[in-house]
Amino acid sequence: MTLTTMNILLAFFFSLLGTLIFRSHLMSTLLCLEGMMLSLFIMTTITALDTQSMVMYTIPITTLVFAACEAAVGLALLTMVSNTYGTDHVQNLNLLQC
């Protein structure tokens, strides 16, 4: 395992740990999820460059598409919860259930 791969895996696991620790605030959780998506993007890009397969070149772009969709939905949810309740606590999301 190279040093670059180890650093990317550590970044992913620290973002995962941050998601578990800061799960009470939606903004912190969204930032940690973005860190996870960034490390996944870098890892898939490195893997695509190492394998030099034409099929693998589409995976990093697909990862970016999913990250953009996740960020848009997260920001919309954060804006709605902040405007409605005045805070970004995740416990307020239980009130949004049907």
Swiss-Prot record:
The gene is MT-ND4L. GO terms for cellular component: mitochondrial inner membrane; respiratory chain complex I. This is NADH-ubiquinone oxidoreductase chain 4L. The keyword Transmembrane helix applies. InterPro entries: NADH_UbQ_OxRdtase_chain4L/K, NUOK/Mnh_C1-like. It catalyses: a ubiquinone + NADH + 5 H(+)(in) = a ubiquinol + NAD(+) + 4 H(+)(out). It comes from Oxymycterus rufus (Red hocicudo). It comes from the Eukaryota. It holds the Pfam family Oxidored_q2. Its EC number is 7.1.1.2. The chain crosses the membrane at residues 2-22, 29-49, 61-81. Core subunit of the mitochondrial membrane respiratory chain NADH dehydrogenase (Complex I) which catalyzes electron transfer from NADH through the respiratory chain, using ubiquinone as an electron acceptor. Part of the enzyme membrane arm which is embedded in the lipid bilayer and involved in proton translocation.
